[in-house]
Swiss-Prot record:
The modification N-acetylmethionine is found at M1. This is Retinal rod rhodopsin-sensitive cGMP 3',5'-cyclic phosphodiesterase subunit gamma. Residues 26-44 have a biased composition (Basic residues). It catalyses: 3',5'-cyclic GMP + H2O = GMP + H(+). GO terms for molecular function: 3',5'-cyclic-GMP phosphodiesterase activity; cGMP binding. Participates in processes of transmission and amplification of the visual signal. cGMP-PDEs are the effector molecules in G-protein-mediated phototransduction in vertebrate rods and cones. Its EC number is 3.1.4.35. Residues 16-54 are annotated as: Disordered. GO terms for cellular component: photoreceptor outer segment membrane. The keyword Cell membrane does not apply. Oligomer composed of two catalytic chains (alpha and beta), an inhibitory chain (gamma) and the delta chain. One of its GO terms (biological process) is positive regulation of MAPK cascade. It comes from the Eukaryota. It comes from Cavia porcellus (Guinea pig).
Length: 87
């Protein structure tokens, strides 16, 4: 009496023979830019249109001391400040 079980054959992955051989490439590598490049110019400090050219504001002049640096950009929205890296 034969008590041996038949051995299962282990096959490796099927290889295509005779086809073009191409080396396998990894995922594409992206280089990060070191400097930011903006399509438009960054905003200038100061309130636009403020000074002696506004009727009723002649006595104030244009010499305004900025106490907080955010006051220099108070004419801009937060998303504009973030776009140019100010905040």
């Amino acid at each position: 009496m034969n008590l041996e079980l038949p051995k299962a054959e282990i096959r490796s992955a099927t290889r295509v023979v005779g086809g073009p051989v191409t080396p396998r490439k990894g995922p594409p590598k992206f280089k990060q830019r070191q400097t930011r490049q903006f399509k438009s110019k960054p905003p200038k400090k100061g309130v636009q249109g403020f000074g002696d050219d506004i009727p009723g504001m002649e006595g104030l002049g244009t010499d305004i001391t900025v106490i907080c640096p955010w006051e220099a950009f108070n004419h801009l929205e937060l998303h504009e400040l973030a776009q140019y890296g100010i905040i």
